[in-house]
Amino acid sequence: MRIISGACKGRVLQTVTGPGYRPAMGKVRESLFSMLEARGVVWGAVRFLDVFAGSGSLGFEALSRGAVYADFIEKDRKAAQCLRKNAESLGLADRCTIHEEDALRVTARRPSEPYQIICVDPPYGADLFKPTLKNLMRGGWMADDGFLIAEVEKSLTINPDAQYDLRLEAERVYGNTRILVWVKNV
């Protein structure tokens, strides 16, 4: 897997392999970042939160494109080690923090400051998107006019629009994966 664009374009990311791991495909990442850029994202002003980060392909792509900072939340030890190796090999370790903790525990706390882009990519079948979203929205994790991205299994029904004052901006399906992008209403 390679970084698609920006300062680290073409650089290889290590990935975690085995049951339960599914790194974001290149076409999914390209589509997602195109959707964000089409909606006016200015990377130099972005703090990015990658929840259930895995190998960190989304957060490292954001950093490569110029995001100011990224936080990665990943409780799996093997994946967290992969995140650390990727941060070092890309020269991005000074622009990110890796939280090797349970996502529900981390998001139950208040952040030091809100994030402009939050990506939530829970393991399929684990029923973690809704409780994580609840913590994120109640805890002040999302900046005004911030974007929330969900990478979930196609069959999962989620509609947080009214409950959390979000507006669905885009939705795409790739095989068994559905990408949804919401913006926070102000």
Predicted regions and their residues:
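Class I S-adenosyl-L-methionine-dependent methyltransferase catalytic core
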Residues: 1-186
